[in-house]
């Protein structure tokens, strides 16, 4: 615990094209080795492709894709009397957003060969429809929490 109280969360400036912090966070997740301009090109092109496929506003596509992949509950390990229990806990909003973005990016990276723009667009479209890697991860997490609901009273 820091003596000066809890640290204030960093504020990420909105991206210049859409004026959205969500897009800026996605760009930062895509970025590898500090190559931000390359990450921006990938994200903007992916959003353009996804919005054309769905005939929807790019920000609306991204927002719905993230909403469909945000976990509501997850399990945390807790050791009680020599046994380790998986205890379901609610996911804070910031962590839920971080997990959703991470799963979308990882799902795009795991999609075989091809350009990252197209893979990210495909993952965004799948997440928008509630399918794909990110949605599958969310369902796994929810299933795990549901299976361990009996230990919810052990929450700390």
UniProtKB/Swiss-Prot annotation:
Gene Ontology molecular function, alphabetical: rRNA binding; structural constituent of ribosome; tRNA binding
Superkingdom: Bacteria
GO biological process, one term: translation
GO cellular component, one term: small ribosomal subunit
SUPFAM superfamilies (UniProt xref): Ribosomal protein S7
Keywords attached to this entry: Ribonucleoprotein, Ribosomal protein, RNA-binding, rRNA-binding, tRNA-binding
Pfam family of the protein (one): Ribosomal_S7
Subunit field text: Part of the 30S ribosomal subunit. Contacts proteins S9 and S11.
Main function: One of the primary rRNA binding proteins, it binds directly to 16S rRNA where it nucleates assembly of the head domain of the 30S subunit. Is located at the subunit interface close to the decoding center, probably blocks exit of the E-site tRNA.
Annotated family: Belongs to the universal ribosomal protein uS7 family.
Official protein name in the record: Small ribosomal subunit protein uS7
The organism of origin for this protein: Coprothermobacter proteolyticus (strain ATCC 35245 / DSM 5265 / OCM 4 / BT)
Organism lineage: Bacteria, Pseudomonadati, Coprothermobacterota, Coprothermobacteria, Coprothermobacterales
